[in-house]
Swiss-Prot record:
The lineage of its organism: Bacteria, Pseudomonadati, Pseudomonadota, Gammaproteobacteria, Enterobacterales. The keyword Oxidoreductase does not apply. One of its GO terms (cellular component) is plasma membrane. Its main location: membrane. Belongs to the major facilitator superfamily. DHA1 family. MdtH (TC 2.A.1.2.21) subfamily. The chain crosses the membrane at residues 13-33, 99-116, 139-159, 165-185, 214-234, 244-264, 277-297, 300-320, 340-360, 368-388. It is a multi-pass membrane protein. SUPFAM superfamilies: MFS general substrate transporter. This is Multidrug resistance protein MdtH. It comes from Salmonella arizonae (strain ATCC BAA-731 / CDC346-86 / RSK2980). Residues 1-12, 117-138, 186-213, 265-276, 321-339, 389-404 are cytoplasmic. One of its GO terms (molecular function) is transmembrane transporter activity.
Amino acid sequence: MSRVSQARNLGKYFLLIDNMLVVLGFFVVFPLISIRFVDQMGWAAVMVGIALGLRQFIQQGLGIFGGAIADRFGAKPMIVTGMLMRAAGFATMGIAHEPWLLWFSCFLSGLGGTLFDPPRSALVVKLIRPEQRGRFFSLLMMQDSAGAVIGALLGSWLLQYDFRLVCAMGAILFIVCAIFNAWLLPAWKLSTVRTPVREGMRRVISDKRFVTYVLTLAGYYMLAVQVMLMLPIMVNDVAGSPAAVKWMYAIEACLSLTLLYPIARWSEKRFRLEHRLMAGLLIMSLSMIPIGLAGNLQQLFTLICAFYIGSVIAEPARETLSASLTDARARGSYMGFSRLGLAIGGAIGYIGGGWLFDMGKTLAQPELPWMMLGIIGFITFLALGWQFSHKRTPRQYTGARRLI
């Protein structure tokens, strides 16, 4: 086996271990934020939505800067620094008793993500061969689902005792992950050339096709982020107990572990990437509309199942399609900018979703936020259809990236 092949094989295992630590650290804390501050402390959902939206916007909106700096200086220092910063954000969140302190903790967490997320995604592009990336993304997403359930279960158990224990566990996991990267991650360069920060950013911004695609995905992310805000609140309201939230993530894990990889393998040679993305988005949009009318857990979990199935279809295609549009000379910059749709959609989804949820309760119309999200999904579906009908995209891809 050549040294390059050996490095790629070892790199796969490194990426999988690193990803599991990050997923566990994230899902121990974030799914429980809305339960802690809305249900237990009685805050308005919009206040928590602002915090979650701020984290999302900082991490994803500034991702192009983190990616461009990583193109210049390499992945390792950015990843280690970012993970330690997220640990500090979680530690601060544990003592948050005022909205401004929660917002500050989410700001720190998001800034840490800005530093470590783009170079981690660029490492996938560097280490995984183009023909293998679609399947590797499916493995990562299956791992995400399993990690989400384990993290949510652990966080829910710790929440029975003290929310500070939840945040401490999340911080410890990110510190362990920082040590893991500092110890084992080689000083790899991300791009084929050591691209200056400004040059990498210029390459991305001048790529109109990539920019249009990324911005269009904002509508997709408005739906996707509700897994962290409105869906847990809805499950808690219907069930009358925050313990039911873990079953929501268990459903996601079961569907992902059983369907994600087989669907990706079966569809990659039969359907174009854009058709898979649009089909998944359509299912997600249709499942959103009736959620506000669900009167029991059986109805609610059925709709959540449909939503997750749509996500299982769409996510690998979205990742792979994003990868096909990258430039190898500025991988970090592309990976960073590709997060802008998530930054915009996530911020609007969290803040707007929280506001609509509160408004729906005030007006005694709980279906209001879900109807609006369904409409946004349909608009995004049409926008993607128009874009893809004018610009052909490849069935496979050449180049890649990833909500945490």
